[in-house]
Amino acid sequence: MDLGVLDFAGGTPVHINSGATATAMSIYLSYPLFRSRKSSTRTPSHLVIHRPVNSLCQLLAMISIWGSWLAFDAGTTLAFNFKSVMALCVTNLCAASGALTWMLYTYAEVGRWSLDSCFMGAISGLIMITPSAGFIDMSTAFFFGILGALFCRQALRIKFTDFARRWRWVDHGDTFATHCLGGVLATVATGCFAQKEVASYDGVTEIPGGVFFDGNVRQLGIQIVEALTGFLWSFIGSYTIYALIDCVPGFEVLADDK
């Protein structure tokens, strides 16, 4: 059934699904069903927080990811036209505003600038723009980056809560906070701020638009259903696959801080 979901470059399959899959793996490793042995000490409180140890490698990784993402979003149009250029521009702006926001937040909190903050902010901005790159204008993209950085940075605190400790849920890569929750926010925000006019820049695409610019309130509900369905599909499917793999002799593991 075609509900008319707006997802320009794959926010659900790229971000929500990957975050759900990583979360399912972390929970399964703490509570294995079959051959793997349960760890009695695996909690977020006893694990060492992994920090980048090589700034040069992190910088090169950020340049590689950021540059590739520009081609990824712009290339989604499968053509070289004004819409592809617009997609590239909003992607770059959203990543930049996200990086700046995260750095400023960190500076206000700890009093120093951080390349790690720039990296995480850029990633959160790129995640925010993925489903909406072909549907929003430059000013909206700028605020998307700010929103994504603030939201994802606060979401990082979840793994240090009592809830995470009780579930022995560990997320060193911050996949749940950035990709999963950030992807959900991006998908929902696309339904709110998508614009018919921007989508038609290629002269072909027609969409009903979003809530605020085109008055299409129904689109918000569609986007929420899409985000929830994508998460549940990947989480349940991945958890089932992990359990089946755990049944195979030789594949069992002991969950630890690795």
Q: Would you name each region that the model predicts?
A:
Residues 1-258:
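Glycine- and aromatic-enriched membrane alpha-helices
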